[in-house]
Amino acid sequence: MSSNQHQGKLVIFSAPSGAGKTTIVHHLLSKDFKLEFSISACTRAQRPGEVHGKDYYYISLEEFKKSISLDEFVEWEEVYKNNFYGTLKTEVERIWKSGHHVIFDVDVDGGLNLKKAFGERALAVFVMPPSLESLRERLEQRETETPESITRRMGKAPIELQKSVLFDKVILNDDLESAFAKAEEIVGAFLGKK
């Protein structure tokens, strides 16, 4: 990444699947923080209602691996077998060139990798579910998950929860309005808005 880019910052939201990070990120995007969503590239199937180039850049496994070999990612992870997710360098540069700060909605390891790559320019926030039971309920309510994917995600969640201590801030999402307020407070302080 070139050093002459706008001195934008990065706000990273990570959590186990179903903890509410996407809902919080969408809320923050509606506020006056000059944030722009970093669209990740992924190899997973597109879900109903999702839009290529808005929710994700949906690419083939072959294309993803080629981009890895060409060092086109800031970070990438094989989140589940043959389901790769990553942040393209061009995506961060695009947002900074527009004069905005980047906001990420990424898995736990991806969030930690971004924090490591960008250091003090990045704020890493972990969204904590109230319990594993509530996490399972949220995944089941999505109606986009198979029993197998719920089992896989729930198997990964305890390990992800242990990594919460590695983040700059933790938001407990037991009440959505409180989580929104805490997210606004944390992000505002980091960006110098409050």
Where are these regions (language model features)?
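NTP-dependent small-molecule kinase module
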Residues: S2-N4, E137, Q141-E145, I159-K194
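Pre-Walker A (Motif I) flank of P-loop NTPase domains
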Residues: H6-V11
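P-loop (Walker A) phosphate-binding loop of NTP-binding proteins
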Residues: S14-P16
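Conserved lysine of the Walker
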Residues: K21
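Post-Walker A alpha-helix
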Residues: I24-V25
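Post-Walker A helix-loop "phosphate-sensing" segment adjacent to the P-loop in P-loop NTPases
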Residues: S30-S38
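ATP-dependent small-molecule kinase phosphotransfer cores
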Residues: C42-V102, D109-L112
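A glycine- and Lys/Arg-enriched "phosphate-lid" helix/loop adjacent to the NTP-binding pocket
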Residues: R44-G49, E72, W96-H101, D105-V108, ...
